[in-house]
Amino acid sequence: MKIDLNADLGEGCTSDAELLTLVSSANIACGFHAGDAQTMQACVREAIKNGVAIGAHPSFPDRKNFGRSAMQLPPETVYAQTLYQIGALATITRAQGGVMRHVKPHGMLYNQAAKEAQLADAIARAVYACDPALVLVGLAGSELIRAGKQYGLTTREEVFADRGYQADGSLVPRSQSGALIEDEEQALAQTLEMVQHGRVKSITGEWATVTAQTVCLHGDGEHALAFARRLRSAFAEKGIVVAA
């Protein structure tokens, strides 16, 4: 069994360099919610050095709230903004001799595209226009995954180690209780259940079916790094290979 392990980088966290030794894919902020040309260049350089797959992490234009504010933008605006961000990272990557492999939206853009078909279509269309060979990463079972498939893109369905799930397989909103899993044992058990058995227990107790093709690691600091190492160790014990 194989699983991709991804992390969102270039967002001002101090643990990026160490995380790049533990993950197989990096989602690099493209300036709309965090990061700038210099951080993008530095993250790409480190990812290439560690053999980590490079991906764009486009967002709504929302640096004030770290891309976590809901926005109702016209699909054509989202298309143009997504195209812009992907293009910037692709060029920076190419200039350093690398190849960009995937795209994963950030924050509220990701969450809204999971449920809003028009928004999902705009993102998938932008990815396809940039490069039909790019992989589109989205929440397992979401509208974004469906849109990607409609454009003939390779999709990668994502699950979260440290997020609570609702009965329909969607994430518990960050504004609600149960959105974040603080207990390391619970997060580890949830991740293994999703990867090995394709299901997750919701905060209301029901089992939801999920397809786990990539696992997202969140957080900064030693706690996040320690959990990443523990997860890698657990995967190794179960014979699960970490690879993009």
From Swiss-Prot:
- Protein name as it appears in the record: 5-oxoprolinase subunit A
User: Which cysteine-cysteine pairs are annotated as disulfide bonds in the entry?
Assistant: none
The UniProt entry, under CDD domains, shows:
LamB_YcsF_YbgL_like (cd10800)
Which GO BP terms apply?
carbohydrate metabolic process
Subunit comment: Forms a complex composed of PxpA, PxpB and PxpC.
Matching InterPro entries: Glyco_hydro/deAcase_b/a-brl, LamB/YcsF/PxpA-like
Give the Gene Ontology MF terms in alphabetical order: 5-oxoprolinase (ATP-hydrolyzing) activity; ATP binding
Q: Which residues cross the membrane?
A: none
Q: Does the keyword Nucleotide-binding apply?
A: yes
Q: What is its EC number?
A: 3.5.2.9
Q: Which organism is it from?
A: Escherichia coli O157:H7
| Physiological role | Catalyzes the cleavage of 5-oxoproline to form L-glutamate coupled to the hydrolysis of ATP to ADP and inorganic phosphate.
Q: Which NCBIfam families match?
A: PRK05406.1-1, PRK05406.1-3, PRK05406.1-4, PRK05406.1-5
PANTHER family in alphabetical order: 5-OXOPROLINASE SUBUNIT A (PTHR30292:SF0), UNCHARACTERIZED PROTEIN YBGL-RELATED (PTHR30292)
The record's HAMAP family line, in alphabetical order, gives: PxpA
Similarity annotation: Belongs to the LamB/PxpA family.
Query: Key word Hydrolase present in the record?
Result: yes
Lineage: superkingdom:
Bacteria
What SUPFAM superfamilies does the annotation carry? Glycoside hydrolase/deacetylase (SSF88713)
